[in-house]
Amino acid sequence: MHELYLWPFQDAVHAGVGSVMCSYNRINGTYGCENSKAMNGLLKGELNFQGFVVSDWVAQHSGLASADAGLDMAMPDSRYWGDDRLANAVDKGFNRTRLEDMAVRSIATWYQFGQDEDDFPELGVGMPADITLPHEYVDAKDPAARPNLLQQAVEGHVLVKNIRNALPLRAPKSLSIFGYDATSAWAANPAEEGNVAGAPDFWTQSWQGVNLTDEQAHQVGSNAPVVDPPGTYHGVLLVGGGSGSNVPAYISTPYDAISQRAYEDGTEIWSDFASHSPSVVASSDACLVFINAFSTEIFDRPGLTDDASDELVNSVASKCNNTIAIVHNVGVRLVDAFADNENVTAIIFAHLPGQDAGRAVARILYGDVSPSGRLPYTIAKESSDYGNLLGPCQAGKGRSPQCDFTEGVNIDYRHFLARDITPRYEFGFGLTYSSFEYSTLQVDINATANDGEPIGGAPVYTNGTTQNTENDSVIVGGLASLFESVGTVTATIANTGSVTAAEVAQLYLLIPDENVTASNSSIVNTRALRGFQKIELAPGDSRQVTFGLRRKDVSRWDTVKQAWVIPSGAFEVFVGKSVLDTPLQSTFTL
């Protein structure tokens, strides 16, 4: 719990986050929004969170029990707290101090973020009082944000394969563009309820996802209807789905942006967005294939691949020896079906770039900027490499499935390290159009950082109402000592290539674990990410990067002492380009 799941929440609370949402699922048999251990014990207790806890939509399952457990606000409404129920509960003995605490936490957050100030942006009204009514249209555009939005879109692209100098493109004479992801969706109209009448669903869960009554496009020269592959989105995938999604003010599609470049360069553009096995113009200097992988609320992808999209890439590659695959994806998407195809010369994970999808990918493809994204997850060679991660709840299906999390801290790259599984593309991996050299690793550690004593115990939280302040070392985020510096790790990075590019230096630590012994081989200790920095360097330039280490970064949670402890022994340091490419290594002892 502490070393993995609570870890990012602790940093978020320490940074001043105002609200935390409790989940739908149960934790050890108790709903998240009435789980006192999670909300009172961990969040408001150990982390000293001063903001409010809000339920996910309709995730409240009780009245006084959820209030006592730490829930401060129920959304979108509450049949348990509505009308005079809470007031009546106080009259019957419910803790009035807790009720006031719920209100204070919500109002204090309002002031924390300056929402009472005159210069605070006017809030749009998106949700009516009657939640069954359509939401009002909210114009959330900010012209000042446009450059930042484009920059984020560009930096979200991860180049994982680039052979035979396929990229960047250099004023090609002829380009062919394929794939259902290269153009706009059939409709983007917030005035319509759900999907536009007569058009197929935007996402397709199976080959049967298009109804016979839907309007259908047809393959060129064929009566066969166009049906998107399973787990995909019809049109360029811009954003995730669900209640947090939006309709962009405009859409720059890959086809539009590349067509503009073609106009400037005098390039011929050929395209086929419908056929699953398209013909290819022989004169094509390069063939771009755009596919995607989509999921949203209440809809999980059937798997981490889809055969139809893979077949499309391989079909084009069988006719074009310079095929470039671009995947707009919501998360892990396996590509082993075509990754080793020698005619697939480049692969880009474009993720969710938003309204500037086309402009962003064009800047990458044409070398206006070197790609600088890195994988925030591991791409396996096959689905089974992830173990039971893809289906941990097979036992006890139904309304109350039981999911036992037995993997400890070894998820994603730590799972692959622990089981010595070679991935297709490792965590932190990503190519650029340049090359970088790492040198001069220096580790400076405070030798007195480890005094052999636990770093405090779990702070006490009483009655779900107020923080025990007897221990003045407790700050927002938890024990103050956890955020104290214990040292630094520095390294020098040089751009040894011919173009300006950004490198993402990454620091990993292997913390000693006394539970790992020759007689207990079931526990495998693995390195963990402890920092990363992105720096842009011109050709020939070099720069030093420095990673700070906190007590938290070199500690383990002792389940017996119920406290953070800095273990004694040798700590291994790894600095490099990814979790598996760490040319600089060292050790220090505490």
Q: For the regions a protein language model found, what residue spans apply to each?
A:
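Short, flexible segments with low predicted structural confidence
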Residues: 15, 24, 71, 128, ...
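Conserved, charged catalytic cores of large soluble enzymes
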Residues: 14, 100, 104, 108-136
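Short acidic (Asp/Glu) and glycine-rich catalytic loops that position anionic groups and cofactors
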Residues: 17-22, 65-67, 79-88, 129-134, ...
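Short, functional N-terminal and low-complexity linear motifs
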Residues: 5-11, 50-54, 69-74, 108, ...
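Second-shell residues forming the walls of enzyme active-site clefts
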Residues: 1-98, 105, 424, 475, ...
